């Protein structure tokens, strides 16, 4: 460690001059300490966000405002190629949820930077990792290399998306500050002629040709290789700012004591491989995904615990990290068929901001770190002074990181338990070096999985903290300097102000607060025990100090008065109490505050002496001035607001699998007649039955195969649809088997016994109908990735004829229009091949269905039924009421369910696999005021049939909001037209 410190220190000394840039712009620069934007150092606190997972553009701003309010100044965004190029050469960057410019405009409006991640490969648990699905037929060549076919495939994408990103760079007044090239591409061979090196150089050339001038970045896939850093074996393809992805939690949804072991060698890693660049985490664990058959996110308390950000994110700060992006900050929904097979409909990810857009305690704790780093400019240039167990502390049970700014001598000591997963409460002393000599911060307590950042020589406005043992939340410079600390209730805090005067003070609140006898002629020390709620200390020199317990800190807000992502201490207002403060301004003494609230509370605003009144969401509050200069008022909650959700009744229904009957006319279907394929996976039988070879890339597929003869004893069928998929087969309308699916199988085979169906078999024109479910295309972490075929991989009759499969003809049907993207608003991954989908029964204003059966009655045999109902909502326009659909089925039910709200497929429910049973639906997909259409498909996979026991609208919460969720969403909900009948 000592040799490494010496080496790193020498590097930093050699780098003490001007920051480095990419030679194309000096607006964004970097050095070993931090990123610099427009000449100012900035701590990049970034939130990963995927607009594809929220198809309502207006709600992007809702989410961005919540990010900004909770301390983030940046979003990291994947741009999924698959979402924008449904068929080769046909790009869509403008229609509804695919409007990239609106993403960037809303980011700028919200006051946050953008790190652009346009791939072309992204991973992200999205189908095919974001590669265009038209390449699933094998036509892209060798993926993620400099292969000529692959180059020709991705180049138009980079040209198109690159041009949009280029005009939105910070150099042009936009929000884009970094451009990531590719994604977690491991440089396993450091050779200038290696295909990956050549591929990276191709990509960088293409991005530059598209107009990108901001620095390039990349994300190392964990500490597994050393890739694309100019500081380590740079043979070509290196980026400007190296980054390391890390998901270190090791947490278990079923064992809360599992994992929680922090990584303490990040500092060494960055010192070895990117020592001329700032330490950057393009993806750090904001949560983690759960698979089919796993635990649902709401059940995973270990991942949701606010102690995770408190310990892990401060651990990163202790290792000199100044760029950190949380994956995910908001996960969203894998609506339609957009998910990769490793995940199901919900992509909540146990992220700080829930899929429902609700603030979790985890986000509230994450905010405390964001607001601290926003104003702590001395943190942006620090050297490692030392670290280790028992370092600068009185206990070997404590690990510390000690950092110091070489220019200002401000210090930051991060403490955590040496065994980071410990739940013990430990008290110890910390030995600090200050400008006035060594001091001891006594009685520092860590209550289990907790971390603290102690500061020395910390400037806030015209004041300086000699040291503090409490965590700083933030500070502001108003008429006076206002400092905010937080601790858990009952913990002891200590701080010393540098002053030559003997300060007097007034205490407002119930924390026990006192001056220490150890005060000197140059500093004055104070000790307190944190009480419940907030305490305010007003000093005689004008300084104001808020002492908050953790719940109060979670409801503390510092809305900026500037749209600049870089917020100065004098560009904010302090607000305490509400559930959320979106933004605020002050003019002529009036604080105009917009936000959301749930429970009745007291709102307190500190904005300096000019403040005279408070307006909340346009309503003037009866406010009273406090003795220390803030204003407070009662803020009503929503406890008394009545939310009435209708029961889902008056169902209509129809058969959605007429294709299993021999009388069905398939004359317009696509004939499977190919005997060769570009796929790297060889078909098991011919003709090729891979669905992508016939232009059906997404959703369920239906096959009809014909054979003659009475002598066959079985049919051997192999299908692939992604993890947890299933398939069913009918012979002349009678179920003969299939595979109901298991969570761990992507491909399954079954030998379907025909000996019990002799009465069904005919001498000629026997029909086998096969329905194959689809759970997305694989990411490249799975063998051939997107090129792993979907649908039927092989089928033959037994006994197998010597020169054939026994089948004389196969036909295929998939989503209406195939790759034509006939519903551009909802996009290319919304629909599959069920009859009800093809003819548009899920769309608003579609024709009535002939039966009045309900999904609660269901089917008494195998098959697929389609159900629709309409309902009306009348939620008050000033409310945000996150809604969802709850589904349940009797124990032992073997079935597959999908449902659509106003045409959007927003849930896949597989009761025999799980785990999801409740599905959030955002405003814009559902109309909070007005009519809605719910459609549901029920696929009974056995002759026992299937039914549901519950289809219910549910509410996740009620919030009075200043955002405005009562809008005309009709442009997002195009209705049915007769053209759909062509796909019957």
Swiss-Prot record:
It comes from the Eukaryota. Keywords: Carbohydrate metabolism, Disulfide bond, Glycoprotein, Glycosidase, Hydrolase, Polysaccharide degradation, Secreted, Signal. GO terms for cellular component: extracellular region; vacuole. Disulfide bonds join 253-300. GO terms for biological process: galactose catabolic process; polysaccharide catabolic process. Its EC number is 3.2.1.23. The keyword Cell wall biogenesis/degradation does not apply. Substrate binds at residues 78, 123-125, 183, 247, 349. The active site is at 184 (proton donor), 283 (nucleophile). One of its GO terms (molecular function) is beta-galactosidase activity. Belongs to the glycosyl hydrolase 35 family. Cleaves beta-linked terminal galactosyl residues from gangliosides, glycoproteins, and glycosaminoglycans. This is Probable beta-galactosidase C. It comes from Sclerotinia sclerotiorum (strain ATCC 18683 / 1980 / Ss-1) (White mold). The lineage of its organism: Eukaryota, Fungi, Dikarya, Ascomycota, Pezizomycotina. The gene is lacC.
